[in-house]
Amino acid sequence: MKKLSSTLPNMLLSLGGICVLVSGILAVVNKVTTAPIAEAEMRAKVEAIRAVAPAFDNNPFAEKLMVLPEGETDSLTVYPAKKGGSLVGFAIESYTQKGFSGLIRVMVGFDAEGRLVDFSVLQHSESPGLGSRIPEWYHEKSETGGIRDVRGLDMKASAPLTVSKDGGKVDAITAATISSRAFLDAVNRAWRTFSSLEGTATALATNSQE
């Protein structure tokens, strides 16, 4: 028993030391990896903004603002695009939780007149070969006379976008109607945010000219 009593404290001390060491290592790893991950995410967003917004010469990422449209519970991040000091449009980071596999995040660009310039899918977990075809499908010309390529759509005349199965004009991805509805939900959310920017857009344009 004497040997056991002398060994137990040593074991506890050893385990405690190991826990402290592991915690320290994890803290260092977290610190080392957090910055690169954040930087990679920022680069991806900057590239998406450039891909979907009208041509600009400012830094939309540095001028971003949070906007809570009427009827929504979550604010969306809005990136103003300016050219020669004039506001030319916005890139809006939108999302939906209605995907077949949950969350889909989309960057949607609009020009100052409310036309949808382009979109870029930032994140999704949709089924390969089905819902994962969102980027390709909604950049292709429709074969049915409906809407498929959403680029250039006058959203003032077209919104809200809905699939043909729901009485709308947008072609759903074959065998992936849920993913199609989810994508349009994200686009419509971005449009509602754009629509709520009227006063903000005027202020931004005025500030740009000063």
List each model region and its residues:
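Flexible, solvent-exposed loop/hinge segments and secondary-structure transition points
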Residues: 2-210
